[in-house]
């Protein structure tokens, strides 16, 4: 559905920061419904501010492709960590597993309770919670 790139965002005063750019695949640019859904999700995600939710820096169109510019996280997705541990005959300990579940739950609870500027619930539901979409960093 989308490609993900590591990029450098240049800002005023020669400030450069690493970012991740998620761009719609070229063949989907003509699918108006997909583009509208992608952009709507990006705008909603940009409204979220929680320590366990990736920060959205910009929602834009780059080279004719809608894209999301987001915070670069240094770490690994949970799937990769679990796979590597399993390959070595190891497993995640109960405390670490509980910490991951607690932080993911806190982020989901925050998103689910999020309201718009007029106080109306956004009724957000994450449709793809999986080890591929949970990212582990040293910061949590």
Model-assigned labels for residue ranges:
Residues 1-140:
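Conserved ATP-binding/catalytic core of the eukaryotic-like protein kinase fold
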